[in-house]
A protein has these predicted regions:
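Conserved catalytic core of the tyrosine transesterase superfamily
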Residues: 1-405
Length: 405
């Protein structure tokens, strides 16, 4: 069998994976693994290759199931963790695929429902310009509707009663907000079906609106002391601290949504003009001024925090290999961790957006200007913040009839 001596790791790789050890190491380094981690991962690869040789397996036989089988036969550490890294070993599959070793697996023919849902997703992304995360949510709701009313994706016999019953079925066990989301997705799917000629009638109106009471409490941000505590909790002597500090400052000073922060790319920053391009909801693109302190924090992270040689164009990346974009969940996790470090009540990233709006209300900024800063498509979204300034509301409140008697 092929043999390759890994002088740096001290591991001798025997078996079917030996010829690919060099490319595997290159890929690990490209994904942000440290030299020490690369040594460990190569040793894990040597154990996997030896196991495959004992099982009389070729490199083309390797897949995720084989890797899990190999890991399942290894003893666990005292803390219950694996002695080998599953995340690292799975990356050998990419090396084998790039080398043309792996045979392309025959894909199962998609069902009529999945074909229809794939077409609906393309419609959402290309025609409606919705965010990819929103498209995923809408497709999931449309899939549930099809499972109930048209398992074979035959929509010609669909009636308004079918639509109404589906909404009632969801509302019987879900919250008003969840039901409202289902109705929005269902209406979009029914409009798509009519446009494509799949239904003889436009049935979206049959998905009745869900009454939702206006929330009794005004939108709440966090006070300045808590905001300062979040920023101070970041250890800017470390890479992760510089990254988290920049993220928190972007959320607090620009009022971006978590997904918008996670989607920021290097080319979105115009350093000469002092502006940043934000890709918002509905495919809308906005150019915002970049405050000096925010720009300095981002530059400090890019120079002395962002993984060197990262091929990704997203600005904010994971610190732990394999490097990749944080995304919406990662940005929210940064906020939660900062709350835990600072000892302040746990909040989500969107509360920091509310914080900016509340601060603008406190200093007398008009609602149209708040809507402009937060990039609300409708002024009604900003009207909620009018309830934040209680003193101003008292000044314009009318006396209760007969209240002075």
């Amino acid at each position: 069998m092929a043999r390759r001596n890994r002088g740096r790791s001290g591991a001798v790789i025997r078996g079917p994976l030996a010829p690919f050890a060099g490319d595997y190491e290159i890929q690990l380094r490209a994904r942000g693994y440290s030299s020490r981690s690369v040594v460990c991962e190569v040793r894990y690869l040597a154990r996997l290759s030896q196991w495959m040789e004992n099982c009389r397996l070729n490199a083309a036989d390797l897949n995720v199931e084989r890797i899990d089988e190999f890991l399942g036969g290894l003893p666990r550490r005292r803390d219950g963790g694996r002695v080998c890294s599953r995340r690292g070993l799975i990356q050998i599959l990419g090396v084998l695929d790039d080398s043309g070793v792996l045979c392309p697996q025959a894909e199962k023919p998609a069902s009529p429902s999945e074909v229809l849902l794939a077409s609906f997703e393309r419609f959402l992304l290309q025609e409606r310009a919705v965010a990819p995360s929103t498209a995923v949510v809408y497709v999931a709701r449309a899939r549930r509707f099809l499972d109930w009313c048209a398992p074979n994706a035959e929509l010609g016999g669909l009636t308004a009663n079918d639509v109404i019953n589906a909404v009632l079925r969801v509302s019987a066990s879900a919250s008003p907000s969840t039901t409202k989301l289902f109705v929005s997705a269902l209406r979009s799917f029914l409009r798509f079906s009519f446009v494509e000629g799949l239904t003889p009638n436009e049935l979206s109106a049959a998905a009745l609106s869900v009454p939702r009471r206006r929330r009794s409490s005004p939108p709440m941000g966090i006070d300045r002391r808590a905001a300062d505590a979040l920023l101070r909790s970041c250890d800017r002597r470390r890479s992760v601290g510089r990254r988290d500090y920049a993220i928190l400052l972007v959320l607090l000073r620009l009022g971006l949504r978590a997904g918008e922060v996670g989607g920021l790319c290097l080319q979105d920053f115009d350093w000469r003009a002092g502006e940043v391009t934000v890709h918002g909801k509905g495919g809308r693109v906005h150019r915002l001024p970049l405050p000096t302190d925010v720009g300095e924090a981002i530059v400090a992270y890019l120079r002395r925090g962002r993984p060197n040689g990262a091929a990704r164009r997203e600005a904010f990346l994971r610190v732990v290999a394999p490097t990749g974009p944080l995304g919406t969940n990662g940005i929210s996790r940064v906020v939660r961790c900062a709350c835990s470090r600072a000892g302040v009540p746990m909040v989500r990233a969107h509360r920091l957006r509310h914080t900016l709006a509340c601060q603008m209300v406190e200093v007398g900024v008009a609602l149209p200007e708040i809507a402009l800063v937060l990039r609300h498509s409708s002024l009604s979204s900003s009207v909620e913040y009018a309830r934040v300034d209680i003193q101003a509301l008292r000044a314009v409140a009318q006396p209760w009839p007969g209240g002075d008697r």
